[in-house]
Amino acid sequence: MTLPIHFPRCVLYGMASAVWSILFLHILVGDTMSAADALSWSGGLIHSPAHRVNVMRSHHHEMGKELEQQHGGEEQQMQRDTKPAAFSNPPHLATGRGPSFVHADGQLDVSCFPHDKNIGSRTTEVAVVQVSSVQDCMKQCQSRPTCSHFTYNKNSKKCHLKDGAPVFYTYTGDMTGPRSCEHTCTDNCWMHSGNPLGTFQYSGHAPAFCWAACKGTAGCVMYTFQGGVCKLYSKNSVERA
């Protein structure tokens, strides 16, 4: 004959309290903590306080890993969204490394100088090469550290690479361009004092030619371009505006 088991009322209250604690923890932390973990944590009936601490540490560690992975994914997406679409390979023109501005179709930007005005340059040549286009001539200039500008003749397909300040003149079929069309300085960029290293009249030409003149002049670190007048200065004769 089996006798019924009777628990003291205090024991029944304790068991009910433990069950409610388990349910409360599971609802509070949602899916991030399983019912088994909640039971282990609240397990005053089963585990020690030290075990409960370890369970909570493990739970927080897993949550931290999830947040870190989420943040890393957002950062990578931001980098993809902000990547330039129109240009690539930022140039390092002062040292002769890298390309000029490149269009999305892979062609160099040669829009800063006229192609049909028969404009040549008398500046000393460092080399003459045979190429098929004005873009190829610009590439040849950029491949040589001392090249400041070039003259391309569309009839002869000859590319004349120059290493000094442009000295313009008229010659049939010629087009003269700077090392890069990137340099688009506006007027009043810099203030100056003292005497300039050189002064050039570049009225009607792009400011990039003033940059080319500075690159081709020893000691030049800065230039001004105002009203078509290009002035070159050394580091001892310029100060930031």
Curated annotation (Swiss-Prot):
Chain positions listed as propeptide in the UniProt record: 35-103
Gene Ontology terms: cellular component: cytoplasmic vesicle; extracellular region; microneme
Domain of life: Eukaryota
InterPro entries reported in the protein's UniProt record: Apple (IPR000177), Pan_app (IPR003609)
Annotated SUPFAM superfamilies: Hairpin loop containing domain-like (SSF57414)
PTM comment: Contains six disulfide bonds.
Residues annotated as signal peptide: 1-34
Primary location group: cytoplasm
Sequence ranges of Basic and acidic residues compositional bias: 64-83
Keywords assigned by UniProt, alphabetized: Cytoplasmic vesicle, Disulfide bond, Lectin, Repeat, Signal
Disulfide bonds: 112-181, 137-159, 141-147, 185-189, 210-230, 214-220
Oligomer and partners: Homodimer or heterodimer of major microneme antigen and microneme antigen.
Physiological role: Galactose-binding lectin. Plays a role in adhesion to the host cell. Has a potential role in invasion of host cells.
Protein name (database record): Major microneme antigen
Natural source organism: Sarcocystis muris
Lineage: Eukaryota, Sar, Alveolata, Apicomplexa, Conoidasida
